[in-house]
A protein has these predicted regions:
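C-terminal catalytic/acceptor-binding lobe
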Residues: 2, 34, 196-197, 202-219, ...
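N-proximal low-complexity "stem/linker" segments adjacent to membrane-targeting elements
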Residues: 1-41
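Glycine-rich, basic loop-to-helix element that forms the pyrophosphate-binding segment
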Residues: 86-103
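Short aromatic/hydrophobic "clamp" motif used to bind/position activated sugar donors
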Residues: 108
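Acidic donor-binding segment of Leloir-type glycosyltransferases
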Residues: 38-84
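Conserved donor NDP-sugar-binding/catalytic core segment of glycosyltransferases
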Residues: 120-180
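A recurrent flexible, glycine/aromatic-enriched loop bordering the glycosyltransferase active site
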Residues: 169-190, 196-216
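The conserved acidic donor/metal-binding loop of glycosyltransferases
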Residues: 112-116
Length: 290
């Protein structure tokens, strides 16, 4: 019989460190266990913390024996883990803002609860953020069921940064907006195979936004407003990650990192009530203010 799982306390967890991983979850015990297993296999970034915030309808996902074992494995390997519940639900943006408030780390990885990271991914992302000095870097998630679906038209949107990423103001209708198409299906995997980077090497490329696995400089994310726009949104929304990244891009720049070590589990979404795009609301307000 599995013994009760210690959730940890904010006082013990919220301390300065190099990196915290922030995971929102709801009704996904199996997927959360896989996501945590990917983190437990990371090396090269000692002592990173993990926050899991659960909004499940019933028992929290981290209470499932498989997920609980991965929590214990992370702690056994020297990683502080804070387990919380955030109810009632007020939408994705509020959940992200809450998670961000739990951290005092230099960098925060916003990781979805249905993403497995291959070994070496965290080291590559942390290195890239440090060397590039921008607001965020990310790994777009691969959909491996699409490996035989090659889409050359999407590949043309891949463009590398020649040096440090520069701030960009990206809006719908601009050519830059279509960069996101490189992240659909297995497009980035196909681009990576075509480029054939040497083992251990990585490249920074231009993005409009990245879903699922984004590493922010925490101070730069907060400087750009974080997810504080949540209070201006209805509960039923999506696209909060896009809204935050557009703001960070405009102030501090950002980049995708190739190769990506992030793999999408391709499970059905638990965000079924998403009538409003958060980025549309935020952008319309910024336009009105001008």
């Amino acid at each position: 019989v599995t013994r009760p799982l210690d959730p940890g306390t904010l006082e013990q967890f919220r301390r300065p460190r190099r990196l915290d991983v922030l995971i929102p979850t709801r009704n996904r015990p199996a997927e959360l266990a896989v996501t945590l297993s990917g983190l437990a296999g990371q090396e090269g970034v000692p002592g990173f913390g993990v926050v899991v915030s659960d909004q499940s309808d019933g028992e929290p996902a981290y209470a499932h024996p498989a997920a609980a074992t991965m929590v214990r494995a992370l702690r056994h390997r020297g990683h502080p883990v804070l387990l919380t519940r955030r109810l009632p639900r007020r939408g994705l943006a509020e959940h992200r803002a809450y998670l961000l408030s739990r951290s005092a780390a230099d960098a925060v990885l916003c990781l979805d609860d249905d993403v497995w990271l291959e070994p070496g991914t965290l080291t590559r992302l942390v290195t890239a953020l440090h060397e590039l000095g921008c607001g965020f870097v990310g790994n777009a998630v691969h959909g491996l069921s699409y490996t035989d679906d090659v889409r050359p038209d999407a590949h043309r949107h891949y463009e590398e940064w020649p040096g440090r990423p520069e701030p960009e103001r990206i809006r719908p209708g601009t050519p830059e907006w279509h960069r996101a198409s490189i992240h659909s299906a297995a497009n980035l995997l196909h681009v990576t195979e075509k480029l054939g980077p040497p083992a251990g090497a990585w490249r920074a490329y231009k993005v409009s936004w990245i879903g699922g696995c984004v590493l922010y400089d925490r101070a730069k994310l907060i400087d750009a407003g974080g997810f504080d726009f949540w209070a201006r949104l209805p509960e039923r929304h999506q696209g909060e990650d896009v809204a935050a990244q557009l703001a960070v891009l405009e102030r501090h720049g950002g980049a995708g990192v190739l190769p990506s070590g992030a793999y999408h589990l391709e499970s059905p979404t638990t965000v079924t009530e998403r009538d409003v795009e958060a980025w549309e609301v935020v952008l319309s307000e910024s336009t009105a203010e001008v």
